[in-house]
């Protein structure tokens, strides 16, 4: 099955992006830039919207890693999750329409570079190993705060670890308590000293 972005339809003729071989029970995953996602069958009569970020054969065990700006909390968060097979649109960014996606990857062991900006531009950036930074939760979970500082940009780095076919990633089933507002495990010792001496200020986006 192929997807032709020019006409926003599927075909069996090799036009556009190859989505793979499909059996009768297989489905297609569609992810949009605003965090909406849904699945469809692979009927050639399907017509898709133009604002598609990802379209691919749905793999229910695939783990996604997202970095997003949470408009409710006014901080950037990193979350890892699996998507559900639903024909109706669901959203992994939350209910606030002002939240937005900064990065989405299906790399098994992604590394994320974080650069600070504004009044925090002088601070050294972070390099986050997403797999050890936060566990796999449901797509509605908030995730873990990247930093208390003003994040200007995030970038996916080349991975240094790779998954093997015999190495599935199991989601955590334990409930994760809400993190304390002052906690930031990604801070350096110097940043913690700033907090202790009262020199650090928090800035909303």
Predicted regions, residues:
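C-terminal interaction appendages of subunits in large macromolecular complexes
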Residues: 1-205
């Amino acid at each position: 099955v192929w997807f032709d972005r020019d006409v926003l339809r599927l075909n069996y003729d090799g036009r556009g992006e190859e989505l793979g071989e499909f059996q009768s029970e297989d489905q297609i995953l569609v992810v949009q830039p605003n965090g909406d996602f849904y699945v469809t069958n692979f009927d050639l009569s399907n017509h898709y919207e133009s604002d598609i970020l990802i379209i691919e054969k749905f793999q229910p065990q695939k783990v996604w890693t997202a970095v997003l700006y949470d408009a409710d909390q006014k901080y950037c968060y990193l979350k890892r999750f699996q998507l559900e097979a639903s024909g109706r649109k669901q959203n992994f960014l939350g209910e606030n329409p002002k939240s937005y996606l900064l990065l989405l990857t299906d790399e098994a062991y992604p590394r994320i570079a974080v650069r600070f900006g504004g009044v925090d531009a002088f601070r050294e950036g972070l390099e986050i190993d997403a797999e050890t930074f936060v566990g796999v939760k449901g797509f509605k979970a908030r995730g873990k705060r990247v930093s208390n500082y003003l994040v200007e940009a995030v970038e996916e780095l080349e991975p240094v670890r790779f998954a093997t076919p015999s190495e599935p990633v199991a989601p955590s089933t334990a409930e994760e308590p809400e993190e304390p507002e002052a906690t930031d495990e990604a801070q350096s010792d110097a940043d913690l000293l700033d907090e202790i001496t009262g020199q650090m200020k928090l800035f909303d986006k």
